[in-house]
Amino acid sequence: MATLSEKEIRDRFNQKNIPKDPLWIEQAYSKSLPYEIRHLLCERLGFLADKGWTSIKSLIKKHGGQPELIYAVGICHQIEARDFLLNQLDEQKDLDINILKALACWGAVLNNSQLELILKSKSQAIRIAGLELLSFKSHLLHETELLELVNEPLKDFRDEVVIKGIKILQRRNEDAVIDRLKQLALNGSYPIAEQALIALGSIGTKYSSRQISELITQLDIKELQQKAKKQLSVQDIFLDRINN
C-alpha cells in the first residue's frame, strides 16, 4: 500500500471510510503523523481486539511504546496484551502513566505491593490512576488492607486525590472504614468533608448513621452541619425501608 498523506487519512475518517483491515491501519500509521491522527488509528486497532493486537505488537516492536500504542494495548482487551502491560509495569524504572491508564480495567490482577508502589507516588496523575486500578480490586480486599492502601492518597494535599479515595471507601460498610470517613469529614477541606458526608450517607448502616449524628454537633461549619443532617435524614429513610 502506498503511503497515505495526513489529508487522505483525515478524509477517510471524516467519511467514515477507514477499512477494518488491521494491516491497512498498521501501514497507515507513521510517527510523522500528528498525534490526533495516530491516536485515531491506534484506537481503531484496539477496537479490532485480537485482530488488532497482532498489528499493535508489530508497531510497538518497530516504534516503541508510544502513548497511542499503549492506549491501543489497553482497549484491545486481550489476555496477552494484559500480560504485556503487567510486564512493562514490573520492568519500569519510573512509573509510566500511560501503562497505568491502559491497565485500568485489569486493576484486580495487580498485587497489593504493586498498588502500594503506585499509590505512594507523589504524582497526582499517577495516584489517581492507581486509585482507578484499586477500584477494580477493592471489593476483594479486607478492610484493613484497603485502608492501608488508601492511607497515603487520603493524606494527599490535593482534594481531587482524596475525593477519589473517598469514593472507593464509600462502597464498603465496615466500622473501620466509617471511622476513617468520619475523620475526613472532621479534618478535611470543605470539598473533602462534603464528599465524606455523602459517602457516610450512602453506606446505610446503623453505625454510619450514629457517626453522622455525632458529626452534626462536631462540625464547625454550619453548611456542613446542614449537609450532615440531610445525609442522616436520607439514611434514616433507607434504614426504615430495610427494617420494614
PLM regions: where:
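HEAT/HEAT-like alpha-solenoid repeats
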Residues: 146-147, 191, 220-221
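Buried hydrophobic core positions in alpha-solenoid tandem helical repeats
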Residues: 24-26, 55-57, 84-86, 114-116, ...
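Structural detector for internal amphipathic alpha-helices that build alpha-solenoid repeat scaffolds
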Residues: 2-17, 26-27, 35-50, 58-61, ...
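Short acidic DE-rich linear segments
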Residues: 241-244
